[in-house]
Structures are given as structure tokens and as C-alpha cells.
Regions:
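DNA polymerase processivity clamps
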Residues: 1-244
């Protein structure tokens, strides 16, 4: 349907709206939507995004006048349309509307699907300390970072150490040596946490933010998730377990 005709027929029916930039930002994390257990795009409250139970990437709708969506999930097939989308909206009846060029197509949510209420992970999760951070120059091109990213996390003990205004990766390839790698510069020198995060998950985030500043919320301990945020995009990552 043509965008002008569509808007005239659906005025006041939208409960969540994302613009082109927010959709593009979210699609950087679209691989999360293709996991075996929770496939697709989730809408919940003011948020839309993806989760695979180990991590969550969502964009917040900044239109304060909109009430937010009921928790729904849409087929993973909509991702191909979102790659080209100028905007998307969730309507009061639960339908997802995606605008590509000047045309709008509607998609029904997956019926009777078990869907995690992603807004609760954003609104109800508690953190210990906060900081802004910036990536050390070209860290994702560093040969040590690349090596740690491809090696099985159970084969090498490695920790993400937030301390004294830095994030340093501490890795133990064998019992006699340690690798130290500066990853982030932090504004809050009192922020402190030693945890284990998945390198591939963190690499995805670092390639998204590039050299721009972003916000960090650190977990209370190494068993809880950390949150990374830039503008309307939230990325929550659970720690991984290391083999003794």
C-alpha cells in the first residue's frame, strides 16, 4: 500500500515507531535474531529488538506520546525487509508495518509464541556502577584481540577487567604467561568489575560504536549481565562460564 494512503487509514493506531537510523543501528545485531530458540524480531513496550538468552540488542522508540507495544514476535523473514526499511511501526492490533521506499507492507505476529518480555530486561535490571567509555584505537584489528576472538573460550582463561579508568583483557594462554590488552578508556575511574564476556559478542559491539563514546552499566558481580548503550540502542551481555 502507498505510504500516504496507509498513513491516512492508520492515523492514531501506531503504538511503537522506529525511524530509518534506529532500524539500521538495530540491524547491525540481526544475527542474534537467527538463533534456534528465539527466531525473529521482538516488540515489547517501547522496545524492539533481538535476544538469544545470552545477549539482548534493542532500540527504544523515542516517541514519548506513543503507549508502547504488547509483547510480540515476528518471523525472522521480516529482517530482509528491515534491511531496506525507511520506517517500521507496531499497530494496536499487533501487526508490524514496514515501509520500503513509498510502500508499506503489514506482517502478523507469530501466534501463540513464547516470547521473553524484553522491556523487563531494560527497565528492571539493577547495576552496580556506571561510566562512559571509548574504544582504544583499532582494537578490533589487533592481532591478539583477533586470536582471542576465534579461540574457544573454554581453552584459554580470559577476563574483562574494568578498573582504574580502563577495560583491560587479561588472558592466560598457559600457566606461565599472561596477555594484557587495553580495550576501553573509562570516564569513571571508580567503576570496577572482573568478569568473563564472550569475545565475539563484544567484538560485535565494538565494531558498532567504532570510535564514538557510549555508556556502560556494570553488573554487581561476575554472574550478572553488563549493559552497553549508545543513544537509543541497548546491548546487554551475560557473562560466560570458564572451565577450571
Amino acid at each position: 500500500m502507498d505510504i500516504k494512503e496507509y498513513n491516512s487509514k492508520n492515523m492514531g493506531k501506531q503504538v511503537l515507531v522506529l525511524k530509518e537510523k534506529d532500524i539500521k543501528d538495530l540491524m547491525h545485531f540481526s544475527t542474534i535474531a537467527k538463533n534456534e530458540s528465539i527466531k525473529g524480531l521482538i516488540a515489547s513496550g517501547k522496545y524492539a529488538g533481538f535476544t538469544d538468552t545470552y545477549r539482548l540488542a534493542v532500540v527504544k522508540d523515542s516517541n514519548e506520546e506513543l503507549q508502547g507495544a504488547d509483547t510480540k514476535i515476528y518471523s525472522v523473514s521480516v529482517l530482509e525487509e528491515l534491511k531496506k526499511a525507511k520506517s517500521m511501526a507496531v499497530l494496536k492490533d499487533g501487526k508490524l508495518a514496514i515501509q520500503v521506499d513509498d510502500d508499506v507492507t503489514e506482517y502478523d505476529p507469530i501466534p501463540d509464541a513464547k516470547v521473553p518480555d524484553i522491556k523487563l530486561f531494560i527497565n528492571n535490571y539493577e547495576y552496580e556502577s556506571y561510566s562512559s567509555g571509548k574504544v582504544v584505537e583499532k582494537i578490533t584489528d589487533d592481532i591478539v584481540w583477533k586470536m582471542l576472538k576465534v579461540v574457544d573460550s573454554s581453552d584459554i582463561k580470559r577476563y574483562f577487567c574494568f578498573e582504574e579508568g580502563k577495560l583491560i583483557v587479561e588472558a592466560y594462554p598457559n600457566g606461565n604467561s599472561v596477555l594484557l590488552l587495553d580495550v576501553l578508556e573509562l570516564d569513571n575511574k571508580k567503576a570496577k568489575l572482573k568478569t568473563t564476556l564472550n569475545f565475539k559478542y563484544m567484538d560485535l559491539w565494538l565494531k558498532y560504536v567504532k570510535d564514538e563514546k557510549f555508556d556502560i552499566a556494570l553488573a554487581k558481580n561476575n554472574r550478572n549481565a553488563c549493559q552497553f548503550r549508545k543513544d537509543n540502542l541497548f546491548y546487554i551481555v551475560m557473562p560466560v562460564a570458564l572451565r577450571d
